[in-house]
């Protein structure tokens, strides 16, 4: 049995500025020690506010924030065992790499030998050994990020907070840094809490993801759970690309949409309950119109390098996106084939607690 330790806990936390609507609205969650977490959502969803509340840069309007079993609402930022890596890295341009990393240790008035040992170890962890005397202006974007991370880990925090640190990098470097950050977190064993609006970053790097919208956590779970079992239309649409249509759950394992009934793997709904149905573009296969489970007309097509994106319209006017290596022509009448496992049925207005209970009931039946 694996024993997990909760390091951060939010209990009914609300953050409101003046008389504006809450930026965070009665949010509760737990962060376990030694994992890589991502707060994911669009601009203004509250993800950076959570980070600032943990860091101590903001104070909660309501609710309690715990570090371990201790309430930290009133503890100032400089007394909390957390360090933040900012979007612009916040490095000192007049200091070289070594002095940037050593800055916090000098503030703590550590002895010179202790500072040197910690700085050298931190630089080794981020693969910057030998860059001690390099000026910040001479560093690339990826190298500057590693300096910022070294400065964060040198203080041996319990938690590292990362506020969209990859957003300023080009695509190739951003991908490389995703692997580096994930590897670094595993080697350090420190809890990382990463903020991003990029769902691909979140899926690639995280042990756990919190999906936020309008100040509320919509869903939390592993990347695979959230991608394969989105709780609602927002999550399904925000995490990857989705085809979402209205449907009706006829009975367990049978759903109706686009005027036809299909076998599925979902259960626990009321007979004839109105639902929303999700099928991912990569789970659709183009066939002849006669062989397809759905008949559609090709509306547009784009070449994406590794595959084509094909947009189609069904008889009800629903739009369908397909990822395929098969080339078709605009105006073609084609069929779409898919397996029962490709269908995901979502209950309207279901809370995360209700959703989790329904998924647990699947396991009990199986």
Curated annotation (Swiss-Prot):
Q: How does it assemble?
A: The complex is composed of two ATP-binding proteins (PotA), two transmembrane proteins (PotB and PotC) and a solute-binding protein (PotD).
**Binding residues for ATP:** 41-48
Instruction: Give every ABC transporter domain span.
Output: 8-239
What does this chain do?
Part of the ABC transporter complex PotABCD involved in spermidine/putrescine import. Responsible for energy coupling to the transport system.
Tell me the protein's name: Spermidine/putrescine import ATP-binding protein PotA
> Where does the UniProt annotation locate this protein?
Cell membrane
Q: Which GO terms describe its cellular component?
A: ATP-binding cassette (ABC) transporter complex
Q: InterPro entries, per this entry?
A: AAA+_ATPase, ABC_SmlMolc_Importer, ABC_transporter-like_ATP-bd, ABC_transporter-like_CS, Mo/tungstate-bd_C_term_dom, NA-bd_OB-fold, P-loop_NTPase, PotA_ATP-bd
Any one Pfam family match given in the protein's UniProt record, by short name: TOBE_2
Q: Which family does it belong to?
A: Belongs to the ABC transporter superfamily. Spermidine/putrescine importer (TC 3.A.1.11.1) family.
What is the enzyme's class at the highest EC level?
translocase
- Cite the entry's keywords alphabetically: ATP-binding, Cell membrane, Membrane, Nucleotide-binding, Translocase, Transport
């Amino acid at each position: 049995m694996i024993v997990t330790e909760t390091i951060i806990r939010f209990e009914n936390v609300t953050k409101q500025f003046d008389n504006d609507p809450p930026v965070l609205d009665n949010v509760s969650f737990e962060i376990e020690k030694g994992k890589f977490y991502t707060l994911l959502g669009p601009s203004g969803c509250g993800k950076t506010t959570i980070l600032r509340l943990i860091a101590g840069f903001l104070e909660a309007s309501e609710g309690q924030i715990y570090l371990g079993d201790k309430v930290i609402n009133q503890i100032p930022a400089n007394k909390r065992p957390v360090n933040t890596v900012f979007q612009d890295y916040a490095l000192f341009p007049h200091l070289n790499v070594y002095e940037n990393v050593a800055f916090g240790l000098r503030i703590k008035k550590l002895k010179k030998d202790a500072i040197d040992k910690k700085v050298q170890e931190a630089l080794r962890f981020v693969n910057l050994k030998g860059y001690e005397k390099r000026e910040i202006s001479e560093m690339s974007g990826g190298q500057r990020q590693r300096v910022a991370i070294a400065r964060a880990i040198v203080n041996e925090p319990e938690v590292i907070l990362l506020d969209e640190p990859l957003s300023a990098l080009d695509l190739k470097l951003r991908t490389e840094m995703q692997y580096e950050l994930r590897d670094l977190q595993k080697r350090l064993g420190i809890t990382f809490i990463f903020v991003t609006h990029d769902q691909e970053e979140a899926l690639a790097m995280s042990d756990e993801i919190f999906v936020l919208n309008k100040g509320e956590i919509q869903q939390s779970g592993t990347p695979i759970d959230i991608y394969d079992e989105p709780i609602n239309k927002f999550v399904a649409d925000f995490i990857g690309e989705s085809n979402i249509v209205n449907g009706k759950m006829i009975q367990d394992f049978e759903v109706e949409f686009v005027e036809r009934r299909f076998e599925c793997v979902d259960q626990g709904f009321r007979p004839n309950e109105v639902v929303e149905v999700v099928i991912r573009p990569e789970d659709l296969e183009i066939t002849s119109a006669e062989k397809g489970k759905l008949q559609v007309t090709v509306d547009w097509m784009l070449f994406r390098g590794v595959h084509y994106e094909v947009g189609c319209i069904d008889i009800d006017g629903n739009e369908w996106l397909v990822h395929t290596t098969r080339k078709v022509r605009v105006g073609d009448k084609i069929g779409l084939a898919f397996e029962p496992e490709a269908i995901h049925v979502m209950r309207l207005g279901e809370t995360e607690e209700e959703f989790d209970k329904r998924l647990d009931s699947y396991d009990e039946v199986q």
